[in-house]
From Swiss-Prot:
InterPro entries: Metallo-B-lactamas (IPR001279), RibonucZ/Hydroxyglut_hydro (IPR036866), RNase_Z/BN (IPR013471). Pfam families: Lactamase_B_2. It comes from the Bacteria. This is Ribonuclease Z. The keyword Metal-binding applies. One of its GO terms (molecular function) is zinc ion binding. The active site is at residue 67. The gene is rnz. It catalyses: Endonucleolytic cleavage of RNA, removing extra 3' nucleotides from tRNA precursor, generating 3' termini of tRNAs. A 3'-hydroxy group is left at the tRNA terminus and a 5'-phosphoryl group is left at the trailer molecule. Binds 2 Zn(2+) ions. Homodimer. Gene3D superfamilies: Ribonuclease Z/Hydroxyacylglutathione hydrolase-like (3.60.15.10). Zn(2+) 1 binds at residues 63, 65, 140, 211. Belongs to the RNase Z family.
Amino acid sequence: MELLFLGTGAGVPAKERNVSSIALQLLEERGATWLFDCGEATQHQILHTSIRPRRIENIFITHLHGDHIFGLPGLLGSRSFQGGDTPLTIYGPKGIQAFIEISLSVSYTRLKYDLQVVEIEEGTIFEDERFLVIAKQLDHGIPSYGFRVVEKDLPGTLLVDKLKVLGIRPGPIYQQIKLGKTVQLDNGTVIDGRDFVGPPQKGRIVTILGDTRYCEASVELAKEADVLVHEATFAAEDSALAHDYFHSTAVQAAEVAKLAGVKRLILTHISSRYQGVLSEELLEQARKLFPNTELASDFSSFIIPRKK
């Protein structure tokens, strides 16, 4: 599991930072990539990475401001042109379906793959046997969502030595036992699979928030997350501007991280007024309150290790 930042700027493209897009690489977990937001030129940013558009499985849109969605039509079309034929689902606020349908229609773009668009409300918006995604609305003046990506716990290690003591040899029965099922052996003995499996491996939690002021929903979504990705559009001294424009300061992002008990905070969505040394000052402001904070730049990559 890896977070790869494709765009870390705010509002409009800048020389140092493109507009918002984050890739959650789940290659080991499901052979796929999930995108969070798709600002202008996201597909161009992808060209500088190892991401393959045909492997993009889901796209989660936080809100409908242009710096978070204007890259969608081009990426969708190019994915088809480059031979992508696997289904793709886009999750986003009400209005995202109209935006996509109109963009593709007026440009005569024909997709060769199945595209599903889901207009979301608060609650569980995605779930399968491995992952769960929960959405909550934030505070941004227009509907803006944060996403809590939960990897479900994995079964514990099969205690092979313990099975061999009972004379149970490797075979299909091992899979049944690893799933914790009750199994009857050839000699009639009944064993409880749970007695032969180690403790479950705790899944990881990644919280990615859209644009927002400080709000309780941010804290709830980030509760005990392994990683919190939070916007830091403004410095602490510009907190009045942050409030007026429905954004957060780096210090407010750190406050959310501390209250939520997260392990790691990554700052993104940085205004172009803070370039070079000034952006490092945002990082230092956050670290005074939450030391395990990092500042994302375009193409920054962060590995999220499994819990021990």
